[in-house]
Amino acid sequence: MDVQFLGGAREVGRSAILVNDSLLLDYGMLTGNPPQVPLDANPDAVVVSHGHLDHVGALPSLLSGDDRPPIHWTPPTRDLANTLARDTLKLHGGTLACPFTETDVHRMSEVSVTHGYGESFDAAGHEVTFYNAGHIPGSAHVLVEDSDTRLLYTGDFHVDDPDAGGVGGQRLVAGSRARPDADAVIVESTYSDVSHDPRGAVEERFAERVARTVWGGGTVVVPAFAIGRTQEILMVCDAYDIDCYVDGMGKDVTRSVLQYPGFLRDADALRRAKGHARFVTGRRGQKKRIADQNTVVVTTSGMLSGGPAMTYVPEIAGHPRNLVAFTGHQVEGTPGRELLDTGQAELDGQRTRVSARVDQYDFSAHADRDGVLEFLESYRDAAVLVNHGDRCVGFASELRENGRDARAPERGETVRV
């Protein structure tokens, strides 16, 4: 089996892997100005691991010509990919920064084929099976089989902590458990050098600080990714009796994933959390009034690169009793990272100094180092191809030192497994 890395090799973003010159796994986009896309591909079929921009962002561009390869995914992933594509059009449509058109996005629905977990199907002459990856609703490990080789593409994944009491993982989705036999594994390595704190401890620190801020007369803005993180934080707030508003794309995503209770750990808990939260429907004036209420606002974007956070954060920036509570990693070069590092950031075109307290809480939906190593324990004899990380080469070297057959391919490289 030949595996070519078109993107996501030795980097996080624009994931794309071509199997046997015919089956494409993911086709993502690396955010930036302009966004970066993988190397060109002309597949016979596409299989998608999950609905995050770095895995689906460039998908519509595959349909810009005469070819119409079928796109295989879970139902939640299909819906999330469409939401992201339309958001990209809203932000960049009609410019050179957008690699596709409204027509291309419409064509995705024409070639869409959905599958559940554990249901094998044919794609470009390969037998393919999805398994829950525990990352976001609908996320999948992808097992690809031809006549000679079984290849497991982990996609992004998260595992529960079996030793944790109470909250051992995400509230939104159950962790990855399936370990199908495979001859080769393409494994993500986003946090291959990081150990996450126990999820229960992170939740408690977050809830305590948020509640203390509100009791002290402050307002809390929680920048959160629309997909996965907004829903997770809603459930945490509900579990700790914290009232909150929700704004941004996360509102639509919450409604969307609730259509698929079988892809959630506890759909009733998310439904209850949604019912207790207040969804913001007004414009800038209402947002400013909410920011003055000493309340909690969960809003996009997670790294302060846009969205309603551009209104809320400047409104609360001037007083130290307020709080900006980041819930995810802040990538170098983003306003969120700048705010963490310097106490100021460019928000909506204005340089803003933030006197409010700024905290960060690790609600990661990726496996940490122990989680990745635990996963790979089931594949001692398999070839390991490390991707989706900033230190793929280093992690592959560590695996080889432990007797593994491991390597970190470069973008454009083809590996035979």
What does each model-found stretch correspond to?
Residues P34-P35, A81-T83, P162-A164, H196, ...:
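Short, charged, surface-exposed secondary-structure boundary motifs
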Residues D2-V47, H52-V56, S61-G228, E232-I233, ...:
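His/Asp/Glu-rich metal-coordinating catalytic cores
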